């Protein structure tokens, strides 16, 4: 009997430890919101077929970087997985089932596949929630090897990493200590929240507020009372005409984050919503 891949339940995720939160199956759970007929076992079987194809080659290699090079050659050259440079903000780039089907994705979705294949082969690959584009990292004897899944798993040296980080740090390149902190392994929860934030951004920027609200709500299933997700869901509810939901979320946001830079905007919405409630009573 073939073991079935069981997707987790949204309402249980907040209490799951970061170390045991399943990465690929929760990423597929995110995709199932948009593709309700998604067959998770199909993609689990697909990943396992990649693993079985690679197993003998990888087991004959002793060094982690060379093992990972074999994985990258297979995924990015033989199978043709690649970054979607032409339509970077296509939401399909964030839905893992679509990345498997089209072999096109964004940095974080490609990283999830890389990590899943590597881990099943015993390779300790981690994600890096790098500013701008998501990366992956592998321990080596003298430190870590950082790779770019959006560009075929290409290795990145310290100088290129500093230059990539610079625009996101006020124009300052990080020193060695700051760079090491940026390159810390990303917990699975952080990776999943970043997938959802990417999707929320795409949907909010294209006025698809029902989906934007859904993405913010899913973040709150992973991280209850996460301030930015409360704000984002509240603003999406406002656009959808769900006034009571907007009022509750935006109030809670200001309670948790009273010094936010957008306090005036949020307070303005709260005043308008409160006035509407008074007028309807």
Swiss-Prot record:
TPR repeats lie at residues 193-226, 227-260. It holds the Pfam family TPR_9. PROSITE patterns: TPR (PS50005), TPR_REGION (PS50293). Signal peptide: none annotated. Belongs to the UPF0162 family. This is UPF0162 protein PD_0709. InterPro entries: SirB1_N, TPR-like_helical_dom_sf, TPR_rpt. The keyword Repeat applies. It comes from the Bacteria. PANTHER family: F-BOX ONLY PROTEIN 21, SI:DKEY-261L7.2. It comes from Xylella fastidiosa (strain Temecula1 / ATCC 700964). Disulfide bonds: none annotated. Keywords: Repeat, TPR repeat.
């Amino acid at each position: 009997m073939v073991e079935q891949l069981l997707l987790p339940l949204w309402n249980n995720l907040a209490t799951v430890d970061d170390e045991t939160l399943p990465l690929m199956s929760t990423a597929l759970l995110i995709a199932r919101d948009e593709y309700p007929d998604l067959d998770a076992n199909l993609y689990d079987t697909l990943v396992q077929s990649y693993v079985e194809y690679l197993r003998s080659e990888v087991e004959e290699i002793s060094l982690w970087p060379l093992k990972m090079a074999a994985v990258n050659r297979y995924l990015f050259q033989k199978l043709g997985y690649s970054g979607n440079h032409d339509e970077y903000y296509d939401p399909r780039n964030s839905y893992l089932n679509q990345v498997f089907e089209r072999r096109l994705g964004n940095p974080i979705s490609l990283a999830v596949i890389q990590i899943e294949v590597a881990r099943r082969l015993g390779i300790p690959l981690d994600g890096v929630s790098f500013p701008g584009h998501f990366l992956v990292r592998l321990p080596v004897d003298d430190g870590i090897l950082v790779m770019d899944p959006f560009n075929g798993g290409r290795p990145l040296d310290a100088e290129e990493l500093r230059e990539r980080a610079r625009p996101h740090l006020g124009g300052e390149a990080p020193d060695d200590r700051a760079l090491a902190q940026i390159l810390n392994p990303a917990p699975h929860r952080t990776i999943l929240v970043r997938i959802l934030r990417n999707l929320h951004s795409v949907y909010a920027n294209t006025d698809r507020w029902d989906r934007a609200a859904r993405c913010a709500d899913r973040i709150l299933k992973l991280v209850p009372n996460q301030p930015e997700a409360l704000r984002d869901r509240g603003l999406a509810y406002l656009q959808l005409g769900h006034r009571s939901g907007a009022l509750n979320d935006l109030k809670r946001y200001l309670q948790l984050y009273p010094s936010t830079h957008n306090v005036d905007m949020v307070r303005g919405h709260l005043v308008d919503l409160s006035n509407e409630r008074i007028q309807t009573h």
